[in-house]
Amino acid sequence: MYFYINSLLLIVSINGWKHWNILNSSICVNEKTNQTIIQPGLITFNFHDYNETRVYQIPKCLFGYTFVSNLFDSVNFDESFDQYKHRITRFFNPSTEKAVKIYAQKFQTNIKPVSHTKTITVSFLPLFYEKDVYFANVSEIRKLYYNQYICTLSNGLTDYLFPITERCVMRHYNYLNTVFMLALTPSFFIISVETGMDDVVFIFGNVSRIFFKAPFRKSSFIYRQTVSDDLLLITKKTTIERFYPFLKIDFLDDIWKQNYDISFLIAKFNKLATVYIMEGFCGKPVNKDTFHLMFLFGLTHFLYSTRGDGLLPLLEILNTHQSIITMGRFLEKCFKMTKSHLLYPEMEKLQNFQLVDYSYITSDLTIPISAKLAFLSLADGRIVTVPQNKWKEIENNIETLYEKHKLFTNLTQPERANLFLLSEIGNSLVFQEKIKRKIHVLLASLCNPLEMYFWTHMLDNVMDIETMFSPCATATRKDLTQRVVNNILSYKNLDAYTNKVMNTLSVYRKKRLDMFKSISCVSNEQAAFLTLPNITYTISSKYILAGTSFSVTSTVISTTIIITVVPLNSTCTPTNYKYSVKNIKPIYNISSHDCVFCESLVVEYDDIDGIIQFVYIMDDKQLLKLIDPDTNFIDVNPRTHYLLFLRNGSVFEITALDLKSSQVSIMLVLLYLIIIIIVLFGIYHVFRLF
């Protein structure tokens, strides 16, 4: 009967006393009276304590509500005393285990209070502007979409908690044999680690509306306390001892010691994530850092969607949201988790491509706003309508980066972050064939040995998921195997970094090539895929695909290079045999007035090491400049060779003799012109004599 009253008091505490009245109550001394107080329509509760009895009478109709029935259903009335005792003693009590820690922070904020700023509406979004800077209210634009009204926890927690009735959004992330459940509410968030037998649950925030069943008290589960929040840890003693002993000692203590605002949490997550990637933990069993990353992911979304009331510049809002989305992309890539989006409807209004310009976000034209908005829209899983002029901006973005770095200069961190967004856009596009093919072929061309050296040196200091990106991690460079990478790095005595590089490539590189119909069936093959506008070149060490093939003969026996050409919309047919074979012919003349060499590729390869690099050629002038001796691109080395891939599927060999002949022919043309001018000048003077 104690459980009934416990449940009743819980109902009262949730809904208030407004509609709940105890009609009759009395106290009497035992054996002093025999008066009967039973009445129809009332439930009588008698509580005996030594020589005193307390009697409560409550209307039966109060127990007809569904949620009341659910509360009573959550109580086990068949539990024996031994079971009850075992239930009490088996849980992990942070206070008795000396695991409780209390922190006092001085919270600060850079959020601008709402003042007498001017207002304007852009894309149905109310904005404020002051001194040409546009602001939005973070409490509005960061509202999370809560799609459920009751958050249901795993079965193991029914021993401790009554059902939680809160608006919430719940997501499940499957990782190997572990399920991470994240439930976000306006007051707190819950993250549980479920392995089938040994579950761990964290609850963080304002936990005043979470009710524990007797004899448990909330204070028994407090694991961390800050100025404004409590962190509850609910699990068994044996679970901590057998699987997660680190929870007794340390759990993100550096977070609680700081002002855990959004920017700090994002930076902490990125630092942990980059180390996690390089150390090869992705796809491995759950460890301490896995706990940290999943908790930080939930904590960041919780604080992002519930804390702060004031104004922030639109660009800062956009960049922060981009970082939040990137955290989710990391989980998808590293933990192989299925996409499970948390939706922010007001943020979608900011992702508007229909406006002429983005001056309300920033007047800095070097910031790739179109790429940012496309990344966010595609990451949300939405089908977006992007005008052609915006796609052109994105295309110009990747072309500008390529033009700057095609002759092997080091990429800056902002440029790497930009390329990360472009790569994600290229991986996510279903339609827009032209732009996604352009993105992938230029990324593939930006990957060369020098970029690999620069990137490897940078990995020691990288602390950000986006700036950690290299174009060598594009989905179409599956030819970069452990052996190839080790060979490249060994030339600079960097082969000790091979594992770090391969760990990073395996996370960033999209596994499937389903965005390209003609090569989707060979996603697992070790090959390079070069996506020109209407055809795709595949370079591999064996026959893998039905198409027109070219075999490179100027390599040693141990090195094989097979080039296969497939049309844009052809059906992907894997094969181990020759399908249609052509010979590679030398090219004798590279001059053209019809842009024959536009949108082509120059491929450098070595007799022993195989493919070295690709260079995308936008027009004939670029090709002439590339093979000019002054650019030092052409290496006069008997082991090094060059091929020219044209956009029509033709493959030619560029030889040193051809280059010299081309240069000589140009000199001869100039010489002929000079001779003709001299002859004409002489004829002119002869005619003047008559």
Swiss-Prot record:
Membrane topology note: Single-pass type I membrane protein
First and last residue of the signal peptide: 1-16
Chain ranges on the Virion surface side, renumbered to this chain: 17-667
InterPro entries: Herpes_gH (IPR003493), Herpes_glycoH_C (IPR035305), Herpes_glycoH_C_sf (IPR038172)
One GO CC annotation: virion membrane
PTM entry text: N-glycosylated, O-glycosylated, and sialylated.
GO annotation terms (biological process): fusion of virus membrane with host plasma membrane; symbiont entry into host cell
Region of interest: Interaction with gL: 174-234
Cell compartment(s), UniProt: Virion membrane; Host cell membrane; Host endosome membrane
Annotated glycosylation sites: N24, N34, N51, N137, N206, N410, N534, N569, N589, N648
Family: Belongs to the herpesviridae glycoprotein H family.
Self-association state and partner proteins as the record states: Interacts with glycoprotein L (gL); this interaction is necessary for the correct processing and cell surface expression of gH. The heterodimer gH/gL seems to interact with gB trimers during fusion. Interacts with glycoprotein O (gO).
Name of the featured protein: Envelope glycoprotein H
Gene source species: Human herpesvirus 7 (strain JI) (HHV-7)
Taxonomic classification: Viruses, Duplodnaviria, Heunggongvirae, Peploviricota, Herviviricetes
Gene: gH
